[in-house]
Amino acid sequence: MTFVGVLEEIVACYREREAFICRDTASGDLSSVSFEEFWTSVSSAATYWTEKRKALPQNEPFRVGIAADNSYPYFVEYLGVIAAGGVFVPLNQSFGAERVLEFAAEIGIPYMLAGAAQLADSEYAAELTAAYPPGRLLPLDEVFAASEQCEPLKDLHKGEPDDTILMLLSSGTSGRSKIVENTNENLSAYPNEVFEQLRPARESGELHHYENLIVLPLFHIGGVIPIVGELARGNSLLISNARQFLQDLGARKFEKLIVAPAMMKRILERAEKNAKVAEILESVREVLCLGAAMSPVLIQALHDRDILPRTYYGLTETTGTVTYRGPYRDGACCTVADFCEIKIEDEEICVRGKNVMKGYYKNPEATAEAIRDGWFHTGDLGRIDEDGYLYVTGRRKNIIVLSNGENVSPEVLEDKLYACPLVDECVVYADGEEIAANIFSVAAAADETKAEEIRAFVKQLNRTLPRVEQIQKLNLSAEELPKNSTGKLLR
């Protein structure tokens, strides 16, 4: 099973259906792209990248990096590189040039794509231009225009199931990112399972077509996997980014939004003040929040608008999806996929299956520590209920260990703080031997009486807690708490 092979089967099935909604960056006009047209573009991009591959010395690996905002051309070149036998390496477009070049040197990236917004920064562009030989630093817009003029490659490279086709930086809230190698089999598992599950619905003509808007970054596994999953369902997507999202939100009557929780929170806040945004949200039936946990406040806000909140469980190391099946349940991450299995070992969630990464690039020690006896140890704490639903309860490395040997789970305390409707964001941590909490509240930032209500809530909460768990220091922030690139609160 290979990624390109699975996508070919999907495209052949839905050939005439709409696959993508695209916005022209110059005119702002929208256009519709069918599955067949999309795959023609991917095949043409594969021709372009095949020629680029031939231009490399034999001993140089064929890897293509990118630092750019989300867009349809980004995704086409993403697949075009893989279909030409290359390894795609998406990097966070907000990285400075120094950090981009640091990872490029560590991984070995002979070609680097860059977005127009990134190259508009003259200092950034100058640093990358100085580091790359002529013809190796490539503007994304120019590459897409050139690849569209190429003849489609008839024999796309499929490779072997264990071939590395994607390298991603592991996401986290602390420490240096590790480089994850995802294989053909890893990336194929989810879209293939979704596609096969829907075969009866396709044959009976009962398959509904949904229009989706996705804004999760393509440098993250949570950006690409939902796209191929929706394509497997025969649905269409508009790939948006933070710069264009509000404009794109009103482009169609989208039934599903695929976003980070922090982004969804901002949309709902805007809808409270803007009747037009509130009207746009009336067509939305479901919101899939990935990249970070949804707070109880956000879940309730979605319910209040008759929008179904959904979340899946997965990591970069598990190629995104571990759980996604079953009807929604508040607080749960659905049930496990058929292509993998999970177990709880000493409270830790462990995963084994086709979606588990090959390993960390040039880091056998970290790989051996993470994958033991075939099981990937996620570092997340959780439980599985009698119906197979997974609940994530915390992160092992976040556990606060006090000098008296007592263990305190910050996530458990954070859930208790979120019971206060005034709390929008919170992080619990240790300050010496005391438990502390940082809280952001929109209401409290504007009204001191609301801040006093939060303090009173925490005081009352402490009366119900063991002494070691009581929150001794409370900091109310007037600004949102710091987050990583996928919206996870930093600790």
What are the functions of these language-model segments?
Residues 188-211, 218-256, 270-275:
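Conserved AMP-binding/adenylation subdomain of ANL enzymes
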Residues 353, 358-359, 381-467:
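AMP-binding/adenylate-forming catalytic core of the ANL superfamily
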Residues 48-95, 214-215:
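Conserved AMP-binding/adenylate-forming
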Residues 232, 254-259, 268-330, 341, ...:
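Gly/Ser/Thr-rich phosphate-binding loop
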Residues 39-47, 161, 180-204, 215, ...:
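Conserved structural elements of the adenylate-forming
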Residues 32-35, 157, 165-192:
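Conserved AMP-binding A3 loop
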Residues 15-18, 151-169, 175-176, 201-211:
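Conserved pre-ATP/AMP-binding loop-to-beta segment of ANL
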Residues 308, 328, 335-338, 346-370, ...:
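Conserved ATP/PPi-binding loop(s) of AMP-dependent carboxylate-activating enzymes
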